[in-house]
Amino acid sequence: MKHLAAYLLLTLGGKATPSAADVKAVLESVGIEADSDRLDKLISELEGKDVNELIAEGSSKLASVPSGGAGGAAAAGGAAAAGGAAEAAPEEAKEEEKEESDDDMGFGLFD
């Protein structure tokens, strides 16, 4: 991620195709050591591609991925089918928590 962030920073700064040396210089300016293997792979993958087009393409791919909102409803349905015994246990645990929290009321740390 740090290599990609430095690459994007350079493109925002006006350098259309940053080199590995450019990215390495940005990282070293803030005290981060660059990994040459990862940096070379990043440069080769992004060579000849427009960063703005890649971002737009990635955004459209992410938009098509389900966010998982429907998965919670299915899990809740399975928990409700477990029966009344499962519902009684959490209520007892909540009551115990209330009792424990009342023990500390009115006591100061440095009294």
Curated annotation (Swiss-Prot):
Molecular functions per Gene Ontology: structural constituent of ribosome
Chain positions with Phosphoserine modification: S101
Compositional bias per record (Low complexity), positions renumbered to this chain: 76-88
One record GO biological process: cytoplasmic translational elongation
Keyword Cell membrane: no
GO CC list: cytosolic large ribosomal subunit
Residue ranges of the region described as Disordered: 62-111
Gene3D superfamilies assigned: 1.10.10.1410
Complex and partners: P1 and P2 exist as dimers at the large ribosomal subunit.
Family per similarity comment: Belongs to the eukaryotic ribosomal protein P1/P2 family.
Name of protein: Large ribosomal subunit protein P2
